[in-house]
C-alpha cells in the first residue's frame, strides 16, 4: 500500500502507544469492565509502528512463537481506519504466516466489532471465554 511503512517500536514510542491504544480500545474496555486503566497495550519486543508518509498512525504486534503466532494488536488511529490499511497489514501478515507455515491466533473483546473484520480475512472463532472471542487463521 502506497506510503505505508512499518518500523520496529522502541521504548521511546510508549506515549504514542498509549495514545493509539486509548483511541482504539478505551470504549471497548469501558463497555467490558466499566473502566479504562490508562495503560498502553505495548511491547517493543513484538510491536511495529505503522507509519504513513513517515508519521505514526498505528501499531501492530505479533508474538511469533514456535508453534503458532499471536496477533496481539492491530490498532490504527480513527482517522486512518476504513481505508484498507488494516486489511493490507493483515494480508501481509497472513502471507508471511503462510510462508513460515504458521497458524495465526488472536483474541478480540466480545463488544468489539473487529471480529467481523477478522472473519472477512478468514479467521474462525475457535471458542469464547468471556469477555474474549478466540480466533484462528490457518492455511486450508
What is each residue range found by the language model?
Residues 87, 111-131:
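Conserved active-site alpha-helix within GNAT-family acetyltransferase domains
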Residues 1-5, 140:
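Short, low-complexity, intrinsically disordered N-terminal peptides in bacterial proteins
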Residues 84:
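Glycine-rich phosphate-binding loop
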Residues 4, 8-79, 89-96, 127-130:
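Acetyl-CoA-dependent GNAT
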Residues 97-109:
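Conserved GNAT acetyl-CoA-binding A-motif
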Residues 131, 136-140:
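Terminal substrate-recognition subdomain of acyl/acetyltransferases
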Amino acid at each position: 500500500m502506497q506510503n505505508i511503512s512499518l518500523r520496529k517500536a522502541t521504548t521511546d514510542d510508549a506515549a504514542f502507544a498509549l495514545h493509539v491504544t486509548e483511541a482504539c480500545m478505551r470504549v471497548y474496555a469501558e463497555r467490558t469492565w466499566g473502566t479504562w486503566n490508562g495503560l498502553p497495550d505495548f511491547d517493543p519486543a513484538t510491536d511495529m509502528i505503522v507509519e504513513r508518509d513517515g508519521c505514526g498512525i498505528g501499531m501492530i504486534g505479533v508474538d511469533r512463537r514456535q508453534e503458532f503466532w499471536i496477533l496481539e494488536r492491530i490498532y490504527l488511529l480513527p482517522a486512518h481506519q476504513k481505508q484498507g490499511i488494516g486489511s493490507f497489514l493483515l494480508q501481509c501478515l497472513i502471507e508471511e504466516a503462510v510462508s513460515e507455515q504458521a497458524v495465526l491466533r488472536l483474541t478480540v473483546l466480545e463488544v468489539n466489532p473487529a471480529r467481523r473484520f477478522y472473519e472477512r480475512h478468514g479467521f474462525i472463532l475457535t471458542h469464547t471465554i468471556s469477555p474474549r472471542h478466540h480466533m484462528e487463521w490457518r492455511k486450508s
